[in-house]
């Protein structure tokens, strides 16, 4: 079972690779707060998903709203991140897709296995759904607010076996 925060989805939409979520994971669960964030920034995408006979995004409601509130306050996370982390705990998820540094740190502290957008792209390449990761990272940098440090950029190229001269 895979749960996602908003940023992985919005960034995959921005580079026109949202299909990767369904190709890699078949179904991805999002908490209500993530659905609401997506409905504000990508309403057309959500209406297209809802029109599908078997949508790959499934919305689930967090049971313990108090834990969400506590996590928001203690870790200084937004609603989507907080609900995604608590839902991951409640559903004992296999993997949480999350990019924000604080959210990732909190999820790991709570014992949740995580990956982010770059991990999704790498898995997409490994499994043959993506030809090359480098042009997708470049498109992310150009078309969104996604930031990749030069060190991480090089590390991802190395992992994707796209580093020139090596």
Annotate the PLM regions.
Residues 1-94, 101, 110-112, 151-154, ...:
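Active-site-proximal, substrate-binding regions of enzyme catalytic domains
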Residues 42-44, 104-166:
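Acidic, PIN/NYN-like endoribonuclease modules and their adjacent C-terminal/linker elements
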């Amino acid at each position: 079972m895979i749960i996602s925060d908003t940023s992985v989805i919005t960034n995959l939409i921005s580079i026109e690779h949202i299909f990767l979520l369904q190709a890699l994971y078949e179904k991805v669960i999002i908490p209500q707060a993530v659905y609401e964030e997506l409905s504000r920034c990508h309403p057309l995408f959500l209406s297209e998903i809802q029109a599908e006979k078997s949508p790959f995004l499934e919305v689930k409601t967090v049971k313990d709203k108090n834990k969400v509130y506590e996590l928001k306050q203690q870790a200084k996370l937004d609603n989507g991140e907080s609900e995604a982390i608590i839902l991951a705990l409640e559903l004992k998820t296999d993997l949480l897709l999350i990019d924000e540094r604080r959210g990732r740190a909190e999820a790991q502290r709570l014992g949740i296995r995580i990956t982010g957008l770059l991990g999704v792209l790498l898995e997409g390449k490994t499994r043959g759904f993506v030809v090359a990761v480098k042009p997708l990272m470049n498109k992310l940098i150009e078309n969104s607010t996604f930031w990749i440090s030069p060190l991480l950029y090089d590390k991802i190229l190395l992992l994707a076996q796209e580093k020139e001269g090596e």
